[in-house]
Design a protein with these regions (language model features):
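Short glycine/proline- and acidic residue-enriched helix-loop micro-motifs
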Residues: 42-45, 115-125, 199
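Short beta-strand-loop/turn "lid" adjacent to the catalytic site in phosphate-handling enzymes
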Residues: 65-97, 125-129, 158-179, 202-205
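Active-site core segments that coordinate phosphate-bearing ligands/cofactors
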Residues: 5-6, 18, 110-122, 136-148, ...
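N-terminal glycine/serine-rich phosphate-binding loop of ATP-dependent small-molecule kinases
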Residues: 1-93, 146, 218-227, 401, ...
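Short alpha-helix plus adjacent loop in nuclease-associated cores
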Residues: 96-112
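Glycine-rich beta-strand-to-loop/alpha-helix junction loops that act as flexible
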Residues: 76-81, 206-207, 253-256, 386-394
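Short glycine-rich phosphate-binding loop at a beta-alpha junction
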Residues: 69-77, 149, 202, 379-392
């Protein structure tokens, strides 16, 4: 039996998951987990990449303890963020997407290239933290003067494990710098913004064999294996992990909720732009989807209002509430507030009981999902009948029920580590086991 290691890192935790083929299906076992999160340093929200790398290596070592022979590993993470490099040296810090540094850069970028033109060329939604705005901020503050490379988070981790540099396609589609038609970097945009063209080489595709662990890392983890490219953007891997048809929708429900469909070609028309849809790369298809604030809202309310309670207890409180107020969870105020409760209070104009906050949040999320389904059907001129939900949110029966009621679609919850399954699936395809 062959074993594969998926390293799936999200904004709040990282997981090392062993996968293998049994009875015609992919079986998985978590062998290591660690906490993740941005830290505040010098007034900015940043990622502690040294700590993340330490945990990645520690998890590989734990995997080898239990499974001495592993065929390969692959890494998927969140998108948009990156590490600037000068030769072999990192240019710190590694800013996190919730940092506010790009607030003053967005209009400056749009003065150079109007957003309508950006969207038509890239098909990439507006998010204030998209890589395009982060790199422009780096340029404005002189951080690109010594940079000769930038590596997205999974690419940086692969580099530290193997010594090899790759630039993977699916994650690059989150940058706002790729041309939707060509699938490569749009050098017209890059030149107009004055970004160094040398930072943007040809992209690598999933299923590429990168190579083995470096001698130093192999010695530290007591083993060696191949490193391959999966869809390194975690949502790309999550969608790969769902067995679905073309007339079905997916919802990757975690810190963010990403609701969309698989298309042969992207859509960058005015309706898509006005409703902030994005076209992200999949393996042989485009993921036409919308980013919704997601379980971040629930987690922040829990942290503030009742950290001692379990999520089951929170759901019970929400079910017992009769409050019917709703909020637009996609408002910028929800992105990185000092108090999530205060955001609700300010929007609703009243203070609520604890259970009411959660009922409002869950119903607002479900309502946003339903509205998004309607928009997708309108924009793609197709009707969809099933909605597959994967990720941590798939375990929330209350939110799933609300989503089914409000959307009118059959909800199929798959409480699996879908990103890890998709990650492992690609590794198996590289080994010709699938």
């Amino acid at each position: 039996m062959k074993y594969y290691l998926a390293i799936d890192i999200g904004a709040s935790s990282g997981r090392h998951i062993i996968g293998y083929l049994k009875n015609g299906g992919i079986q998985s076992e978590e062998v290591y987990r660690f906490r993740n999160g941005m830290i505040r340093k010098d007034g900015h929200l940043v990622w502690d990449m040294q700590h993340i790398l330490y945990e990645v290596i520690r998890g590989i070592k734990e995997a080898f303890k239990k499974y001495p022979v592993i065929e390969s590993l692959s890494i998927d993470t969140w998108g948009v963020d990156y590490v600037l490099m000068h030769g072999e040296k990192e240019i710190w810090p590694c800013f996190g997407y919730r940092d506010e540094r790009t607030d003053d850069d967005i209009n400056e970028v749009w003065k150079i290239i109007p957003f309508t033109e950006l969207y038509t060329r890239t098909g990439c939604q507006f998010q204030k933290f998209n890589t395009i705005y982060q790199l422009y901020d780096d340029k404005q503050h002189g951080r690109l003067e010594e940079a000769d490379d930038f590596l997205m988070i999974p690419e940086y981790l692969i580099y530290k494990l193997t010594g090899q540099r790759v630039r993977e396609y699916t994650n690059a589609t989150t940058t706002g710098l790729l041309n939707l038609e060509t699938g490569g970097y749009d050098h017209y945009i890059i030149e107009k913004l004055g970004l160094p063209s040398g930072l943007f080489p040809k992209l690598d595709q999933p299923k590429m064999n990168v190579g083995c662990l470096s001698e130093e890392v192999a010695k530290e983890v007591n083993g060696n294996l191949n490193v391959v490219l999966c869809a390194t953007h975690d949502t790309g891997s999550a969608v790969e992990g769902i067995e679905m048809e073309d007339d079905e929708l997916y919802l990757s429900s975690g810190t963010w909720s990403l609701l969309g469909v698989k298309l042969k070609e992207g859509i960058a028309d005015n309706d898509s732009m006005m409703n902030n849809y994005t076209n992200e790369g999949g393996i042989g298809y485009i993921r036409y989807q919308k980013n919704i604030m997601g379980m971040w809202v629930i987690n922040e309310l829990k942290k503030e209002l009742c950290p001692e309670k379990s999520f089951d207890e929170i759901v019970k409180m929400a079910e017992q509430s009769s409050y019917n107020g709703l909020v637009d969870v996609n408002l910028p105020a929800f992105l990185s507030p000092s108090s999530m409760k205060k955001v609700f209070d300010d929007i609703l104009g009243e203070h609520l009981e604890t259970g009411d906050y959660f009922r409002c949040a869950y119903r607002s999320l479900a309502g946003c999902y339903a509205k998004t389904v309607e928009e997708i059907e309108h924009n793609t001129k197709r009707e969809y009948h099933k909605l597959y939900i994967v990720g941590g949110g798939a375990k929330n029966h209350y939110l799933n029920r609300l989503t089914e009621e409000m959307s009118g679609k059959k909800v199929i919850a798959l409480p699996i580590e879908s990103s890890a399954i998709g990650n492992i699936k690609v590794q198996m395809e590289v080994e010709y086991e699938l």
